[in-house]
Design a protein with these regions (language model features):
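Structural beta-strand segments of beta-rich domains
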Residues: 28-32
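Low-complexity, acidic Ser/Thr/Pro/Gly-rich terminal tails and inter-domain linkers that flank the onset
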Residues: 7-26
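Short Pro-Gly-centered flexible turn/kink motifs
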Residues: 88-102
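The feature marks short-to-medium sequence segments in extracytoplasmic or secretory-pathway proteins
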Residues: 47-89
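Asparagine-centered strand-capping/turn motif at beta-strand->loop junctions
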Residues: 34-41
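Terminal connector regions
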Residues: 104-144
């Protein structure tokens, strides 16, 4: 069953990768970089909401420090239905990348090992594809 899951994820038209510096100081910004890649044969319209492509306007991440949840402290946007301006086109074989500073939306002022998973998955309009973004880990060190 695990092989089937991995195969399904590998064949998804929209691939999501997340990255941050693996070690940083608590007094430094920490950009979360999201890279979306269209592995499909046709273009995809990707909704920017709940992603670094838009910035922080929703609680879209599960973040823990030493297995304790870190609450979201950023702005919350009240939304209706998305309009055409809320999507961007990602052509077949194309990749797009955006980043947003995690320290603007989450309290990362304590040293320790953090785990981040993306709860709100990027959405696509044309194929209904919602990729799984990988879980990532990083360490915050005391201020220098």
């Amino acid at each position: 069953m695990m092989t089937l899951l991995l195969t399904t994820l590998a064949l998804a038209p929209l691939q999501c990768d997340l990255s941050v510096k693996t070690q940083s100081r608590v007094n430094e910004p920490l950009p979360l970089v999201m890279t979306l890649t269209n592995r499909g044969e046709g273009p995809l319209e990707v909704l920017s909401w709940f992603t670094p492509f838009e910035g922080w306007f929703a609680d879209a991440i599960d973040l823990t420090l030493d297995d304790r949840p870190i609450p979201y402290k950023g702005p919350l946007a009240k939304r209706g239905n998305p309009g055409a301006e809320d999507f961007f086109l990602l052509g077949a074989g194309q990749q797009s990348q955006a980043d947003a500073d995690l320290t603007l939306a989450y309290d990362l002022s304590r040293p320790g090992r953090y785990q981040l998973s993306y709860r709100a998955q990027p959405l696509t309009l044309t194929r209904g594809v919602a990729p799984r973004c990988p879980v990532i880990h990083f360490t915050r060190l005391p201020a220098s």
